[in-house]
């Protein structure tokens, strides 16, 4: 997934073209992401570290009668310099994510 609205990108660790966060130095990093979907839709995402699945985020609006559903998750990951983290859809299960209301953040702890 590419989060195209970037409000802060200290050190340019987030690549807006690829959606990848690249560690500029080694250490422990915290990552958070939020997904919003509308009534009747769902969207499943994964956070990935160098191609390895770390955690899921399942946003399910199929059981609500109106409005939107949101879901968030956090992952703490030990990274080496130049390691990459990104968010991807899970196994083709992404049906609808409400663009401007989804976000991703990462920082060194």
What positions do the PLM features span?
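Extracellular jelly-roll beta-sandwich "head" domains, especially the C-terminal globular C1q domain
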Residues: 1-109
């Amino acid at each position: 997934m590419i989060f195209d609205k970037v409000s802060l990108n200290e050190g340019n660790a987030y690549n807006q073209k690829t959606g990848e966060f690249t560690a500029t130095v080694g250490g422990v990093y915290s990552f958070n992401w939020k997904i919003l979907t509308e009534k009747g839709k769902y969207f499943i995402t994964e956070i990935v570290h160098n191609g390895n699945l770390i955690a899921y985020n399942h946003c399910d609006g199929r059981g609500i009668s109106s409005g939107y559903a949101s879901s968030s998750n956090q992952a703490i990951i030990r990274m080496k310099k130049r390691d990459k983290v990104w968010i991807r859809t899970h196994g083709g299960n992404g049906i609808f994510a409400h663009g401007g209301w989804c976000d991703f953040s990462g920082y060194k702890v």
